[in-house]
Design a protein with these regions (language model features):
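Elongated, amphipathic alpha-helical interaction scaffolds
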Residues: 1-310
Length: 310
């Protein structure tokens, strides 16, 4: 078996936002939003995925939207690249979605709570090791909530370090699925025992995709590669500008600093031995690593790269 990565816009919508994905999405949201509690019993997926619709990266910045049985709405985004002003965009999209609930003449009592769940393939909050973080309006000193109407939640995939053999909770298994599905060759028994994850893996099985869907997936992956290339080029140009302006950092040291920063943003803090290996890389190897880091899914991939290129 070969599984597609759930991190692409196409795959995420197909797995979690299709018309038949209700049970998959219920299990996922109960695990992530409600801390492995069976809170959600039913939901309605708004504007479910249809093949052939996704043409560009993040036309709407909103992968999946669902109304829960408690009246709340969850908007879910899978974000692969840490683009400029990303954090502000998340706030803007949540506030805009909340305000757009009302039609002309409707009163504020018609407003219902909104949750923005963002799954990031990079590190957002370097000051904490928490993988799942939740933000609400709180009083500054006594920290009591002001109207639980707006919630921001983030899942930082690079902070997830667990191997398949030590997965415990439902959230562990869902995050492992999102992080590592392309590395699987069969459906592991520990994931298969969760029927919704088994269903998600069957959807992600490349053999079950139509030619139209395979073409759409290829287009998405190409767009992501192109975007990564643009970011890599901008990084290189930044180094050259810094060198020409005489910042006082040699090209190799400047490249090393940038690569280490990229690694920290993607994987969080790395073991000392990995840091030592990075310190020993030549300028040429640092340049290559800077280009290829976006394709390394987990810390083990980075360790393997260093072992082969050190």
């Amino acid at each position: 078996m070969k599984f597609i990565s759930p991190k692409t816009d196409f795959a995420f919508k197909k797995i979690f936002g299709s018309i038949h994905s209700q049970n998959i999405l219920i299990s996922f949201l109960n695990a992530i939003v409600y801390n492995n509690q069976n809170i959600i019993q039913s939901l309605e997926i708004i504007n479910p995925y249809n093949p052939g619709v996704t043409n560009t990266i993040k036309e709407t910045y909103l992968d999946v939207k669902a109304v829960l049985d408690n009246g709340s709405t969850v908007i879910i985004e899978m974000q692969v690249l840490n683009v400029e002003d990303f954090e502000k965009r998340v706030i803007y999209n949540l506030a805009k979605a909340y305000g757009n609930q009302l039609d002309v003449g409707q009163g504020y009592m018609m407003l219902t709570p909104f949750v923005a769940l963002t799954i990031a393939d990079f590190v957002l909050f370097e000051n904490t090791d928490k993988m799942i973080t939740k933000f609400r309006f709180k009083e500054e000193t006594e920290l009591f909530n002001y109207q639980d109407e707006l919630t921001l939640m983030f899942v930082e995939l690079p902070k997830f370090k667990k191997e398949l053999s030590v997965l415990e909770t439902l959230s562990d298994k869902w995050i492992y699925f999102i992080s590592s599905a392309p590395n699987l060759e069969v459906i592991p028994s520990s994931l298969e025992e969760v029927s919704e994850i088994e269903s998600a893996l069957n959807i992600a099985n490349m053999a079950n995709l139509s030619n139209e869907e395979l073409e759409e997936l290829e287009q998405q992956e190409k767009l992501i590669r192109d975007k990564k290339g643009q970011i890599s080029l901008a990084r290189k140009e930044g180094i050259e500008i810094g060198r020409e302006e005489g910042i006082g950092i040699g090209r190799e040291e400047g490249m090393r600093i940038l690569v280490k920063r990229q690694i920290r943003r993607k994987f969080g803090e790395v073991p000392p031995e990995v840091q030592t290996q990075i310190e020993q890389l030549s300028l040429e190897k640092l340049d290559i690593l800077g280009d290829e880091i976006f394709d390394l899914a987990i810390i083990a991939d980075l360790e393997n790269w260093l072992a082969n290129n050190g």
